[in-house]
Regions:
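Helix-loop-helix units of permease transmembrane domains in multi-pass membrane transporters
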Residues: 27-58
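Cytoplasmic juxtamembrane interface segments
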Residues: 101-147
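Transmembrane alpha-helical core residues of multi-pass small-molecule transporters
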Residues: 56, 90, 122-126, 199, ...
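Terminal transmembrane helical anchor/hairpin motif
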Residues: 130-205, 209-213
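Secretory targeting signals
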Residues: 1-16, 55-119
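Long, hydrophobic alpha-helical segments
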Residues: 6-32
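Hydrophobic/aromatic residues in alpha-helical transmembrane segments
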Residues: 21-25, 34-35, 101, 121, ...
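Short cytosolic juxtamembrane segments of multi-pass membrane proteins
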Residues: 214-220
Length: 220
């Protein structure tokens, strides 16, 4: 069943793609430092260099993901369902988000070990700790109406947004969790998906912009 395959791949995508993107992105930036210093001595704008490095990494990573996940599924399942397209969209989006976060951290931190450590901690925060913090808040303040607060908090975690997008597409209430059910209740599946996609790509634009701002002021 294509739907079951998509759901099985969901957990792999939500955990492995962000980890690979953020760690590989950080290592790529540090390893390209001498190359960046050489190019900055030429008449090349910093915005062109930064975006060139970013796109030069995210596009191949996205292509590898699309080829590795898309071709086998098309071969075995034929025509892809809507849920599978969402799976591809979420994987590509998370690649762009966490590569942008990796670049931002690598620009801020001069030390390679410190930078890689920060990226791993950030991944752990989004993948595991963030949901635990939300559950603690809900448990501690269970007497208060926290639906809107929970919706707002869910927008600040790109991994949660990807999970919500997938589960809204399949409309599986038992697997949606608290935030997914709230998205479906308050926004409906279609509008909720649109809100999640917009928030996810805001997560791409914001760290890219912050990373460029820091990169443009950095003294190499």
């Amino acid at each position: 069943d294509p739907g079951q395959v998509s759901l099985s791949l969901m957990n792999v995508v939500l955990f492995i793609i962000p980890l690979v993107s953020i760690v590989f992105g950080t290592m790529f930036f540090y390893n390209s430092r001498e190359f960046m210093e050489l190019l900055l001595s030429q008449p090349i704008s910093r915005v062109a260099l930064f975006l060139g490095l970013y796109l030069g990494l995210t596009l191949p990573l996205s292509a590898v993901y699309l080829i590795g996940v898309g071709i086998p599924f098309m071969y075995h399942a034929g025509i892809m369902t809507g849920g599978y397209w969402i799976l591809l969209l979420v994987g590509v989006s998370l690649t762009w988000v966490f590569t942008a976060l990796a670049f931002f951290i690598a620009v801020l931190s001069e030390q390679r070990v410190k930078g890689i450590g920060m990226t791993i901690v950030l991944w752990l925060f989004f993948a595991i700790l963030y949901d635990g913090i939300i559950l603690f808040i809900l448990f501690a303040l269970e007497e208060y109406p926290l639906e809107k607060l929970t919706l707002i908090l869910s927008l600040f975690n790109p991994i949660d947004l990807g999970r919500i997008l997938m589960l809204l597409q399949f409309d599986i209430a038992a697997l949606m969790g608290y935030t997914g059910a709230l998205f479906s209740k308050f926004y409906g599946n279609m509008f909720g998906s649109a809100v999640a996609v917009l928030a996810l790509w805001t997560w791409v634009a914001t760290p890219v912009w912050l990373g460029y701002r820091a990169f443009s002021r950095k003294d190499f």
